[in-house]
Amino acid sequence: MSLFRRVGIIARLDKPQILDTVKKLMEYLQEKDIAPVLEDQLATMMPGVKVASSALKELGDHCDMVMVVGGDGSFLGAARAICNYDIPVLGINRGTLGFLTDISPHNLQEELDPIFRGEYHEEKRFMIEAKIKRQNRPSGEGIALNDLVLHPGKSARMIRFDLFIDDQFVMNQKSDGLIVATPTGSTAYALSAGGPIMLPKLDALVLVPMHPHTLSNRPIVIDANARIRIVVCESNLTYPSVSCDGQLNITAAPGDEIHITKKAGGIRLIHPKNHDFYNVCRDKLGWQSSYRP
């Protein structure tokens, strides 16, 4: 008998082939006497299908596992929505890179059978949260699995800000912004900005400057439990934004303080038993694959 009896399904909605994959997934689950629970918007895209559905934010109340059909962006959105539930998440890749979505849509049964027999690898990925204070009052907040990014928003101007770690002054920086990335996010935007790749199991964060005016400003790897404080200097003529996984933007103002910390809990990510992070890097990043001893 499967360890999972009710499986929530979240999917990207803009591609017909994704709905085809969802239908195949539902048939697979029902054949195994596992009840699928569709996210509400997905359910509206599949008229005539008689299965349970739920609002995204409440999906974790109705299932003991969630499957995401889409790419890394879909997975990130799902992670933020269900992160307060202690349920595992599995990704079926219908995107491009697919660092977080391991299962091929072309081999569903072959790749899912072992997982529903309990033959899988599970790892915990932590998340981070940002809280913006304006004149010591809350102004906005957001969470991220990949990264929180301070950027100019709609303006092409550089930003000047002060950076503090655990209340110790680090630097005053003038740049296009700052990426604060988790190990999960180290292979995303932070990597393209010159940051290092971090193993997913590391309890660390990387701070990556974006086009700093001082060329000696380099990425810094810090303890994941450190308290980061960014003060947007009063001299700025623009209102920068804080982006959460590139999907949610919060506007900051000159004088605002941005507090970034590790979020309690996290995401339980399911991988196939043979999952290998270095193999994923070779495949997704185009590393040389031949071994020459």
Swiss-Prot record:
It is an enzyme of class 2 (transferase). The gene is nadK. Its cofactor is a divalent metal cation. NAD(+) binds at D72, G73, N146, D147, R157, K174, D176, T187, A188, Y189, A190, L191, S192, Q247. NCBIfam families: PRK01231.1. Its EC number is 2.7.1.23. Involved in the regulation of the intracellular balance of NAD and NADP, and is a key enzyme in the biosynthesis of NADP. Catalyzes specifically the phosphorylation on 2'-hydroxyl of the adenosine moiety of NAD to yield NADP. Pfam families: NAD_kinase, NAD_kinase_C. InterPro entries: ATP-NAD_kinase_N (IPR017438), ATP-NAD_kinase_PpnK-typ_C (IPR017437), NAD/diacylglycerol_kinase_sf (IPR016064), NADK (IPR002504). SUPFAM superfamilies: NAD kinase/diacylglycerol kinase-like. Its main location: cytoplasm. The lineage of its organism: Bacteria, Pseudomonadati, Pseudomonadota, Gammaproteobacteria, Oceanospirillales. It catalyses: NAD(+) + ATP = ADP + NADP(+) + H(+). This is NAD kinase. Belongs to the NAD kinase family. One of its GO terms (cellular component) is cytoplasm. One of its GO terms (molecular function) is NAD+ kinase activity. It comes from Marinomonas sp. (strain MWYL1). It is found in: Cytoplasm. Keywords: ATP-binding, Cytoplasm, Kinase, NAD, NADP, Nucleotide-binding, Transferase. GO terms for biological process: NAD metabolic process; NADP biosynthetic process.
